[in-house]
Regions:
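Secondary-structure "cap/kink" motif recognition
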Residues: 1-343
Length: 343
């Protein structure tokens, strides 16, 4: 083989590598090409005016609204949404920067999760509104991690882009809510009632700061031993951290005859808990809270929310209450079961 022929492949390879370098997307491309600019135009300008956000993925739709300065989730009984969650979404959308130009063929949108026509699609649509006027409509698709990037396009355009950054979008309405709705301080609880059973805390020694729980002197009915055993183990710590799986306007619920009422007397005030056990065992239950604050207590935001909503508890939290209720209604001994205290 001649020396001239042996150099041809090397020259071809060099040319290809050179073309790859000069056509590789640059982080300093001009705004004229549409790159290096925000994926959501004018978001920073309109941010303060935005009062509505719609999110869709397939058949799932979420509506967030601002009313009198308070954000709420219309898809979850108008339950309040913390401003930090909204701000995080808007900041991440604003920081989403067009980095590389990708396909503008609608037939290839599905490959990067930007096809919104499929009911089971993974594309996420986000609409931003100001006084009912649509100001932005973007579609987010597949994410990559090294470096962090997201495929995206404007809903009215077929042109797609690979953008710098990620946007964390929750497509479950409950995911926008602070699901911890009750955190009563266990150490401040002094009395508990469960239906007709009353318990009082007695300090038996300095080492036991929380004391022990005994039947109140004013109990009128006999309390089965198993019910007392379960109540002592489970009730003192039960309301220290409650989380919900769903919310419902209180006016929309019909309470069954199998509703248990508990009260907790604590330093902050008196907590009244109603749990509807009318549904089948293992399915959870709806829970309502009412609160009478002690004199001089600063009113907490959650206290004002409690009368408006019911909270769906998981079976994990309902099981000990149901167990005590069953023991209260029975005179026979239950088989020894592990305590559920600390739930």
């Amino acid at each position: 083989m001649s020396k001239k022929k042996s150099l041809m492949p090397l020259a071809a390879i060099t040319t290809v590598l050179f073309l790859a370098v000069i056509t590789r997307p640059s982080s300093q491309v001009t705004a004229k090409d549409g790159l290096g600019t925000p994926m959501v135009p004018d978001l920073k300008t309109n941010a303060e005016a935005i009062d509505g956000i719609a999110i869709r993925q397939g058949v799932v739709a979420i509506s967030l609204q601002r009313d009198a300065g308070q954000w709420k989730c219309s898809s979850a009984a108008d339950y309040p949404v913390e401003w930090d969650r909204i701000r995080q979404l808007l900041v991440q959308l604003d920081q989403l920067e067009r980095w590389e130009t990708k396909t503008q063929d609608p037939a290839r949108h599905a490959a990067v999760d930007l096809d919104v026509s499929a009911e089971d699609g993974r594309a996420i649509e986000i609409e931003l509104f100001a006084e009912s006027d649509l100001v932005s409509h973007v579609v987010l698709g597949k994410q990559q991690w090294s470096p962090k990037s997201t495929f995206a396009r404007l809903a009215t355009e077929d042109q797609t882009f690979k953008c710098k950054g990620h946007v964390e979008v929750e497509v479950n309405p409950i995911g926008w809510l602070n699901t911890t709705f009750c955190t009563l301080d266990r150490s401040g609880i002094t009395e508990i009632t469960f239906a007709s059973m009353g318990l009082v805390r007695t300090n038996t020694s300095p080492e036991k700061s929380e004391g022990t729980w005994q039947l109140a002197a004013n109990n009128l009915d006999a309390v089965p031993s198993k019910a007392l055993q379960f109540a002592r183990a489970d009730l003192p710590g039960w309301p220290t951290r409650l989380n919900f799986e769903a919310v419902l306007p209180r006016a929309e619920h019909q309470w069954s005859s199998d509703t248990v009422v508990m009260t907790y007397a604590a330093q902050e005030g008196q907590l009244i808990v109603s749990i509807d056990l009318g549904e089948r065992e293992g399915s959870g239950a709806w829970c309502g809270l009412d609160f009478v604050p002690s004199q001089g207590q600063n009113i907490q935001p959650e206290w004002t929310r409690w009368p408006r909503w019911l909270y769906r508890l998981s079976d994990y939290r309902v099981a000990p209450i149901r167990q005590i209720q069953q023991a209260m209604q029975s005179n026979f001994d239950f088989s020894d079961e592990g305590s559920t205290s600390g739930l």
